[in-house]
Each structure stands twice: as C-alpha cells, then as structure tokens.
Amino acid sequence: MMLWQATPASLWQGRDDSAEAPNALRLFQTIARAERFAPQEMPGDIALLGFACDEGVRRNKGRTGAGHGPEALRRALANMASHQGHDRCVDMGTISVDGEQLEAAHQALREAVAACQRAGKRTLVLGGGHETAFGHGAGVLDAFPGEKVGIINLDAHLDLRFAECASSGTPFRQLALECDAQQRGFHYTCIGVSRAANTQALWDEAARRQVAVVEDLAVLADFDTHVLPELERNIAQYDRLYLTIDLDVLPAREMPAVSAPAALGVPLAILLRIVEPLCRSGKLQAVDLVEFNPQFDIDGQGARAAARLAWQIAHWWR
C-alpha cells in the first residue's frame, strides 16, 4: 500500500487499572494494531485509519497543522475507557501525504478505504484537513458500486468550491463529479452550515446540486423540526451512509483547534444527538473527523472533544 505506515505502539499508551478488575480496561489495551496493511487478516469490524495530510488546507489558504491530527487524536483516545463496541476497533495505520502530492494521497486513501470496506470493516478515519472526505468518500463509492450512498456532512462550510486543483474546500464538488462519472446519484446533506461563512456562489452550487442544507441557526432553534426529519430521510432513502464531521462545526469555545474556528457553531451535545441515530441505523458505513489542528489546541480541550466524538461513535455503531 503506497504512502502507508503502521501506527507505532508508542501512540497507544495509558493508565493501567487492570489490577483493580479484569474489565478495568482502556482503549490502548483493547485495540488491535496492524503491522502490515492486510485488513482481511485483522480482527474487528471498525477500521481506524489516519490521513496525515493538510496540503488541501494549504491550497485553500487555511492554517496548516491538521496533518498532525491523527497522531494527536490517537493519543487522546488511548487512555479512554474501553466499553461495549471498542474492542471491535483495529488500527489499520496511516496514509501520509508526500510533500504537496495531494492527488497521490487521495488515491492511496481511496484504495485503503475500499480494501477495508470489502474486507467487511467499516472505516473511521482521523484527518487531516477536509480534503480527507474525497479520498474517504470515493473509497466508499468504489466498495458499493450498485448502492445508493448518502453523504452527511456536519460542517460550517459547504465545501463545494470551484478550483483549479483539489483542496480542503472542494471535496464535495469532487465527489459530485465522481458520482457523475460513475452515473450514480449525488446525495449530499450538510448540517450546521453558517450562511456567514459561505458565499452566494456556494449556495447557488448547493441549490444546483440539490444539496439538502440545515443551517446552524435552524439546528439551534428547533432540532426536532429541522434536523430529525433530515436524519430520518437519509436513513430511509439510502443503502449506505457516509458521515463526515468537520470539527469547525463546533463553537470556538469547544473547538479552538481548527483552521477556521466558528463564532456560533453547533455544540458537542447537539452533535451527539445527530450522530446517535445514524450510528444505530445499521446503515452507517463510514465516518471521519477532520480539520483537528493540535497546533491551535488549548490545554488539550479540542483533542478531548474530538476523541469523545470518535469514542461515542465506536460505542454506538451497529
């Protein structure tokens, strides 16, 4: 596997409470770790993958540093308690960008995701900038060519930019073009969008692509009226679901460690209300958490918030 590296055992360290009781375990004690990329040979049905890349953020004129996200998030996860579902996780290593070669990294991630999915594993990818979503989403599309895949993005931004080259602002336009090329529907829902952070051109493109959008104000005003029906529609209409969480959807007070912190945002407690029914639906095939930038974290606050999201997803995933 090109651009792939196994995760060092040193990243999975934590407090050992096993002297108290046999089940006093933490994630670092229950996660399996692949020494080579062979998902069909590994136990568990949740493949944890890193995408150490922020070349897309650089191209999008953002604050770089998210390439260090996978390592920081693994460290944050390692010491969390291991409960139901967590022993299904296997660390399948990290795809790392080589210099500015984003397109090659995209292809490597795409192939790694498709291989994991075909081996019967759902994928939980730790980014990396939001360019992660193109490689991840394309891998899911490749693994399920005859099925309807719904894409749900929790994000302050639509990420449908027109640009000469791929970036962290283009992944869903790229996925739309990929769906066009494969002659399949592009089914995209974006929840938590800030109207103040997206130009009219992006809203026009969303309308042209028939994107279902729920703005941040609507999420905060009435969850049951604006959000729940969209979740229920996605679960009912599509065969598989791909959930991508841009951590800049969170308020800056909860998530300072991103390229573009949100002035308003959707709080973590509400994000968990969105995530739970998707995890329990039996249709959620893939999840990623992107844009975490440890360079801008404050006392590990952002890492803990992101890790709690990932922890909860693995716990609820059915």
UniProtKB/Swiss-Prot annotation:
PROSITE patterns: ARGINASE_1, ARGINASE_2
SUPFAM superfamilies: Arginase/deacetylase (SSF52768)
This protein's pathway: Amino-acid degradation; L-histidine degradation into L-glutamate; L-glutamate from N-formimidoyl-L-glutamate (hydrolase route): step 1/1
Binding residue positions for Mn(2+) 2: 155, 157, 246, 248
Pfam families: Arginase (PF00491)
BP-aspect Gene Ontology terms: L-histidine catabolic process to glutamate and formamide; L-histidine catabolic process to glutamate and formate; putrescine biosynthetic process from arginine, via agmatine
Cross-referenced InterPro entries: HutG, Ureohydrolase, Ureohydrolase_dom_sf, Ureohydrolase_Mn_BS
Family per record: Belongs to the arginase family.
Protein name listed in UniProt: Formimidoylglutamase
Gene that specifies this protein: hutG
